[in-house]
């Protein structure tokens, strides 16, 4: 469960992580009969989680901008109250949360979760090249954001 929650937190932010984690386990219960054992259960559950989270962003449609604006407001408040003694992990998490949705999704799937660009492309419905460019953009943005924090 912590792995699914952490994935949801990284991809969608801390406010949505609890609800998305619950949605993943509800969906897993509903789809359990479809588990064929071709991979480990953890791998199947993780892939299901990625799909549920991405589906949530797709169904948000125009509400997605409002969701992202709310996330930005939370980040602004969090940034204003931060002390000088936060560790690099907290700075990195805040920087990841500031990435545009597409770049953040690719970054988390590739660099954090270990997916290959071809797998990411299949999940997101984009080419491997698009995944690579999104990852490059995410890494560049993170460098800039983390330099500002230093």
Predicted regions and their residues:
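Arg/Lys-rich amphipathic alpha helix in sigma70-family domain 2
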Residues: 33-36, 50-68, 85
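Acidic, proline/glycine-rich intrinsically disordered inter-domain spacer in sigma factors
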Residues: 64, 71-97
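Structural recognition of an alpha-helix C-terminal capping motif at a helix-to-coil junction
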Residues: 19-26, 39-51
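Short, Lys/Arg-enriched C-terminal cap helix and immediately downstream tail that follows
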Residues: 58, 104, 139-150
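A short pre-motif secondary-structure segment
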Residues: 106-110
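Short, charged helix-capping/linker segments at alpha-helix termini
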Residues: 5-23, 128, 150
């Amino acid at each position: 469960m912590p792995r699914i929650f952490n994935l949801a937190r990284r991809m969608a932010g801390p406010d949505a992580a609890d609800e998305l984690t619950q949605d993943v386990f509800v969906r897993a219960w509903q789809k359990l009969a479809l588990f064929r054992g071709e991979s480990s259960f953890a791998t199947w559950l993780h892939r299901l989680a990625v799909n549920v989270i991405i589906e949530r962003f797709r169904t948000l449609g125009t509400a997605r901008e409002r969701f992202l604006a709310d996330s930005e407001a939370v980040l602004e408040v969090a940034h204003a109250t931060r002390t000088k003694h936060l560790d690099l992990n907290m700075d990195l998490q805040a920087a990841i949360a500031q990435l545009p949705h597409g770049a953040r999704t690719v970054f988390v799937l590739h660099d954090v979760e270990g997916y290959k660009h071809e797998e990411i492309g299949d999940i997101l419905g984009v080419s491997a090249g698009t995944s690579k460019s999104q990852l490059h953009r995410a890494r560049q943005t993170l460098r800039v954001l983390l330099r500002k924090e230093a």
